[in-house]
Amino acid sequence: MNSNNTTIFQTCRQAAGITQERAAELLGISVRTLAAYESGSRPVPPLRAADMVDLYGTQFLAMQ
């Protein structure tokens, strides 16, 4: 994790131009849960990571 506590999940979401609120809504999770995934304080379940790959339009996450 880098110095400002972002993860590749946050970086990919931001690169896709999607707000945290919108991403959480589209993923069917709370903003708090998404924030926990993005900060690295909660592991991202494999199926949720697959949903993020689809939503953010990046295959980079699929390789992680």
Per-region residue spans from a language model:
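Short, conserved catalytic or interaction motifs in soluble domains
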Residues: 39
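DNA major-groove recognition helix of helix-turn-helix/homeodomain DNA-binding modules
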Residues: 46-63
